[in-house]
Amino acid sequence: MDATYVGAYGRLKVYEVDFLKKDFLEHLISLDKPSDFSSVLYASVYKEDYDALTSIYREPDLTEMAINRHLVRMNRIAAFAIPPLAKNALTAYISKWDIENIKTVISSKFLGHGLKETEMFIVSFRDIPMGLIGGVLTNEDYRNMMNLPNVEAIINYLTRYGYGSYMLQFIEDYRKTGDISPMLYSLDRYYYARLLESLKYYNGDEGPVINYIRSDIDRINLNTILKGKKLNISYERFFSGLVDGGNIPINAIHDFYGNSDILSMIDSIKRYYDLEDAKNKYASDGNLYHFDVSMRNIMITKYMGTMSMLPLSLDSIFYFIIRAEIERQNLRTIYEAKLHGAPKESIYDLMINGVV
């Protein structure tokens, strides 16, 4: 344990009571209408977020943005609580939202979507962009990028940061093929390489965080090959999109892809991850999301409990910010289901469990 984490741990413990409990989420699932969801969420710790945005947005956008804003607020709490020696690790982790936002902006520009259509998916556009906490992209940067004429202009804009320079190596392929996926994949590789480099052993007790990140890389890679197999794409087409640094070696990923179908691929992965339940659900309805949800739940169950039990360490801070992410994802899942009239029973298959 490190005494420099004492203040951080104390501050975060105060705010942990703000996390929504399992029975609250189940109550949200039981509601019939999106407006009921919004009313109940407004009456919780999310009231501040609604009030800050109510003059700018109307439903259903207001609830989406309030959920995003709350995540930013929780991450700010963690960012300002962290000891100086741990700042690089947290900054590298939080930059994931820069990555997601950049992907959103590039994809929207590629599809011809405008500013209004894009800002709903930026975390967070009108209030405080997540990258600002990490000292990278600002609110103005996102506005500027969304107003640029095309994808290449966005890449050139990003060259002032590390992201754009890394993506430039794929610009010629984009010009030839019109395919933006290699550039988007490159952002994942850039992010995880930088993150793993930042997570050097400081006290020797950051193992759970590192293992969680390695498992997340496995999740990304498994999602990639499962989509590839579903679409019958050759391995060479997406090999450049695989991320190094996971628990599963890249050559093993290649071997998995050699299986004839998705079900046999999942069987061969079993020595790393038991996805049998997700496999059965996929066999029933053909939806790949079961595997992603199962991977996330495995990671949460395996590592989050340990992180929470190492109070004076980097683990306790990562526990806080990962828990905030899970809450956001679960709330968005429930709300989207309400907006689209999905059966209540189906929502449970999409929920990330294990921490509430």
Swiss-Prot record:
One of its GO terms (cellular component) is proton-transporting V-type ATPase, V0 domain. The keyword Membrane applies. Pfam families: vATP-synt_AC39. InterPro entries: ATPase_csu/dsu_sf (IPR036079), ATPase_V0-cplx_csu (IPR014272), ATPase_V0-cplx_csu/dsu (IPR002843), V-ATPase_V0D/AC39_subunit (IPR050873), V-type_ATPase_csu/dsu (IPR035067), V-type_ATPase_csu/dsu_dom_3 (IPR044911). Disulfide bonds: none annotated. It is a peripheral membrane protein. The keyword Nucleus does not apply. It is found in: Cell membrane. Component of the A-type ATP synthase that produces ATP from ADP in the presence of a proton gradient across the membrane. Belongs to the V-ATPase V0D/AC39 subunit family. Has multiple subunits with at least A(3), B(3), C, D, E, F, H, I and proteolipid K(x). This is A-type ATP synthase subunit C. It comes from Thermoplasma volcanium (strain ATCC 51530 / DSM 4299 / JCM 9571 / NBRC 15438 / GSS1). The gene is atpC.
